[in-house]
Amino acid sequence: VTGSPMAEVLHQNLAEIEASDVHNRLGLEKGKYILLSAHREENIDTEKNFLSLFSAINAMAEKYDMPILYSCHPRSRNRLASSSFQLDSRVQVQQPLGFHDYNCLQMNAFAVVSDSGTLPEESSFFTSVGHPFPAVCIRTSPERPESLDKAGFILSGIDEKGLLQSVDTAVELVKSGDYGTPVPNYIDENVSTKVVKIIQSYVGVVNKMVWRKEI
């Protein structure tokens, strides 16, 4: 009914996102790092999936030979600490990054590799404001197929072959100027206004017809 509030939130914070000094603080060069977020229960807590995904991440580090900045959630950090799995030295494990810093890193990354549910929305928004980035979703099924249908991101799966092919494809498409098409509801910036007007418009009707209240 209302669309996603993500674009409105990002738009309201865009100046702060663009002004972030996170690259200087972390010693990163724009366009020469991969931003990673991997925290989904199915990717972290299931042994087979965990080993498949993180082996693929190590292969990605070896292939591209650039820093992989891992914004690491507590679930993932604890899983890595309890495992004997060794991450490639190019994977830099960081505490979870703040909103402004993370989004600044997204829009300046060589590629964003993430299992976050908001990746399709962020990709659509940043494309719409002139900051497209190669977006790769490390999951086996999408939560937001409407963005996949608009070529807003690539669903890679969690195996090495799928991940490497997907990063290659996403990067080359963005380089060629083919960014996909933003999903209209993902770039709608008046969601809060719609919510207020819908509530004000329908509260009387709902109270009368659903809850049988006398107004």
Language model features with spans:
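Nucleotide-activated sugar donor-binding and catalytic core shared by glycosyltransferases
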Residues: 1-215
